């Protein structure tokens, strides 16, 4: 049987459910697929299909993630749901499933709980642009004032982490009732309302091709009589022949002009996001440029050595360290295409970090890397991955 062609009629958005264990994330995921399959076509997925999520490997880390899709009036959503708390932490830090927005699920019967807070913090640290809230299990709360109180608590918690708590949409309902086909206000209409809030509140992400040109350099060749060629996959934006570009990272930033673009041995006028290209650079010697630098639009990205990061440390079972590490730990940080040694400073009050933990840390690299908030990296020891992280704040 041939795969049916994916028709891209509607803009595509990546979302995911976050929130405390047993607050109803997976039930809501199932309800979204069911209610929207009835409204706009598509497949309904049962709770147990989603809950038995297959394990995937992302950057050497095993993560259990369920992927479902559904459509609203105006959008196509790809939605991730994780069975366990550890899977969420890993997923958000590695960016294995990039989220354009998150649906925070809070049980109206319990209110915000420790993982509610932790997931909101992670969403802030890894740069999730927007959150909408589903106040679930509202059928179990008889008191309208109590519902209002829980909503206020959630809004305050979001504001604590620099989300717009006052204006974030909060939809109240029961995912289970919706899944059972209940048409009362708490049931299916609440799911429709949630999706309308997602359509309105989660912004359309910029397409990679619309960003500022950036290409991590993977290899460097010199072609006699023509000059130096750097190769790599264009991460975002477009590079046209004749345009000025900068080489950023490791050493001092240099400016040059791209005098040729080739792909599959053919000469092109331009290369764009997703293309694997070779770019010919004017006046650059083979030794002036190296793997680990980036080619980019001038002034669009700057080199840095000092940053804060949110990091997940692999457990022993995942092939990580068998022992904890301490302040002053000096592993390699693998950014895009290369390793750079760095020194770790742990937060005050944190003596050590155990395999399987996630931790906020400050890192000082021995050489600068073209960096921006949200950049992902791996932590390695002798070529073996022992952690994964994301830059949450550039310090200098």
UniProtKB/Swiss-Prot annotation:
CDD domains assigned: EF_Tu (cd01884), EFTU_II (cd03697), EFTU_III (cd03707)
Region ranges (G3): 81-84
Reaction(s) catalysed by this chain's protein: GTP + H2O = GDP + phosphate + H(+)
MF annotations from Gene Ontology: GTP binding; GTPase activity; guanosine tetraphosphate binding; translation elongation factor activity
Sequence ranges assigned to domain tr-type G in this UniProt record: 10-206
Source species, domain of life: Bacteria
UniProt key word Nucleotide-binding: yes
Residues given in the record as GTP binding sites: 19-26, 81-85, 136-139
Enzyme Commission numbers on file: 3.6.5.3
Region named G2: 60-64
Cellular compartments annotated: Cytoplasm
Region (G1): 19-26
Annotated stretches, region: G5: 174-176
SUPFAM superfamilies, per database record: EF-Tu/eEF-1alpha/eIF2-gamma C-terminal domain (SSF50465), P-loop containing nucleoside triphosphate hydrolases (SSF52540), Translation proteins (SSF50447)
Binding site for Mg(2+): 26
Region ranges (G4): 136-139
EC top class, as a word: hydrolase
Function: GTP hydrolase that promotes the GTP-dependent binding of aminoacyl-tRNA to the A-site of ribosomes during protein biosynthesis.
Oligomeric and partner information: Monomer.
NCBIfam families: EF-Tu, PRK00049.1, PRK12735.1, PRK12736.1, small_GTP
Protein name: Elongation factor Tu 2
């Amino acid at each position: 049987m041939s795969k049916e062609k994916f028709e891209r009629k509607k803009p595509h958005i990546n979302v995911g459910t976050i929130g405390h264990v047993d607050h109803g994330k997976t039930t809501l995921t199932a309800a979204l697929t069911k209610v929207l399959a009835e409204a706009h076509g598509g497949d309904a997925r049962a709770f147990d299909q989603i809950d038995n999520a297959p394990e995937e490997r992302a950057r050497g880390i095993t993560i259990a993630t369920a992927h479902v899709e559904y459509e609203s009036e105006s959008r196509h959503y790809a939605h991730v749901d994780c069975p366990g708390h550890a899977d969420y932490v890993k997923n958000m830090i590695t960016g294995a499933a990039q989220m354009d927005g998150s649906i925070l699920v809070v049980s109206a019967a319990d209110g915000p709980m420790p993982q509610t807070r932790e997931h909101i913090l992670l969403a802030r640290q890894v740069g999730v642009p927007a959150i909408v809230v589903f106040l679930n299990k509202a059928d179990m709360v008889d008191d309208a004032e109590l519902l209002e109180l829980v909503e206020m608590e959630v809004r305050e918690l979001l504001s604590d982490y620099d989300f717009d708590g006052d204006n974030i949409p909060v939809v109240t309902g029961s995912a289970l009732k919706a899944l059972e086909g209940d048409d009362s206000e708490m049931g299916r209409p609440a799911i429709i309302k949630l999706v309308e809030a997602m359509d309105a509140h989660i912004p359309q992400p910029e397409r990679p091709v619309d960003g500022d040109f950036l290409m991590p350099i993977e290899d460097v060749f010199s072609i006699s009589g023509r000059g130096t060629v750097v190769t790599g996959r264009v991460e975002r934006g477009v590079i046209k022949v004749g345009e000025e570009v900068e080489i950023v990272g490791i050493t001092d930033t240099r400016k040059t002009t791209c005098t040729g673009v080739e792909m599959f041995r053919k000469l092109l006028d331009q290369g764009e996001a997703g293309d694997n290209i070779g770019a010919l650079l004017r006046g650059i010697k083979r030794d002036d440029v190296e793997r680990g630098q980036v080619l980019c639009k001038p002034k669009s990205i700057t080199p840095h050595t000092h940053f804060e990061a949110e990091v997940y440390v692999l457990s022993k079972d995942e092939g990580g360290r068998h022992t904890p590490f301490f302040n002053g730990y000096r592993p390699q940080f693998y950014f895009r295409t290369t390793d750079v040694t760095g020194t770790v400073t742990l937060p005050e009050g944190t003596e050590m970090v155990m395999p399987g933990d996630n931790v906020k840390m400050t890192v000082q690299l021995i050489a600068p890397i073209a960096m921006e908030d949200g950049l992902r990296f791996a932590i390695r020891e002798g070529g073996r991955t022992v952690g994964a992280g994301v830059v949450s704040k550039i310090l200098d």
